[in-house]
Amino acid sequence: VAEQVLADGAADMVSMARPFLADADFVAKAAAGQADRINTCIACNQACLDHTFQGLITSCLVNPRACHETVLTIEPVAGDQSAKRVAVVGAGPAGLACATTASKRGHQVTLFESDDQIGGQFNLAKQIPGKEEFAETLRYFGRELEETGVEVRLGERATAADLTAYDVVVLATGVTPRIPDVEGVDHPKVVTYLDVLRDKVPVGEKVALMGAGGIGFDVAEYLTQNGPSGAVAPEVFNAEWGIDATYASRGGLAAPTREEPARSVALLQRKESKVGAGLGKTTGWIHRATMAQRKVAMVPGVTYERIDDLGLHAVINGERTVLDVDTVVLCTGQEPLRELQAELEARGQVVHLIGGADVAAELDAKRAIQQGTELAASL
């Protein structure tokens, strides 16, 4: 975009801020014709603006070394260290960061991934309206795998026997949706967020989302999106938020016009606090505003009783009610996938857990990429 702005003569200079947190070599790579190696800012705000407004050191989700360059150093293997054979199991954000960083340092790295593509949870995230740029992170890591010489084994589910020859095993095997202990959770109208985003199971017109964390909000945006996303279609964004790019309206402000939501959605949480209170400090408000625009019912203080043909039976504000819904989507947390750990440790192998396999309570790409990078830097 910046190149096009200059080429079109629309500006003499393009200023950037967050993109240089994501990749300090942005300009050098562009000048060298290596734009495909730029670690692109995904506009998430999670480690830059959110940190700033919390009084924390500014950094970057996709580049944890930003503002920590003298602390988190990536040095070639030397001295009392020796190059190791490293197996990284799982090619999500944590595994990708670990594998590429370890290989840059001189370790011999093999990356195992049971899927036929890299990305893990980012392959789900990039489908969410407004998160399309997450695909750029996978493009970046794909190129880094090539450049750093990581041996990538896609479509291969590693077993303990496959990993015996490695000096270090890193389990970045991710998570699986947590199934709550609610009567009727096995009813045909119940699906998980993974069923919806990955497997594309059909979803009805009336939907209840159990769980209003980050995943719940993402699924709500996904299910209510009607037509192209405003993140990739500026005219849609302008219409939704009442922006008159022609300035025919006073101050460039016009009456918002929005598509009707694709579905009727209720976003439910057990906690009695404000729905979405745990979202990012600088982005939570926009998610809640979008939900309001799309007529999503955001309901706190819900006790789930059972699910049956009639719908979702619950207690809300002390009153029993039945939500007449076609589909119930479980966004009720995750469980770590780390079955290999016990067998590997029993064999005496060095095993490290990173990403969701380490802490599955809330999916956190910032923590995952930081963990992967820091571990690789320490090997």
Where do the protein language model's features map onto the residues?
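Repeat-solenoid scaffold signature
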Residues: V1-A32, E144-E156, A161, E205-F217
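Flavin-dependent oxidoreductase catalytic cores
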Residues: V1-V89, P93, C98-V109, Q117
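Rossmann-like dinucleotide/flavin-binding elements
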Residues: L6, S82-S114, R153-A161, A165, ...
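Short, hinge-like loop/turn segments at secondary-structure boundaries
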Residues: D8-G9, A31-Q34, Q127-K131, T283-W285, ...
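Short beta-alpha connecting loops at secondary-structure transitions
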Residues: D12, F122-G130, I354-A361
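Helix-enriched interaction subdomains in cytosolic or periplasmic regions
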Residues: I42-I57, Y166-V182
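N-terminal Rossmann-like dinucleotide/flavin-binding domain of flavoprotein oxidoreductases
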Residues: G120-Y166, G276-V302
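Short, hydrophobic/aromatic-rich segments at coil-to-beta transitions
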Residues: D308-H313
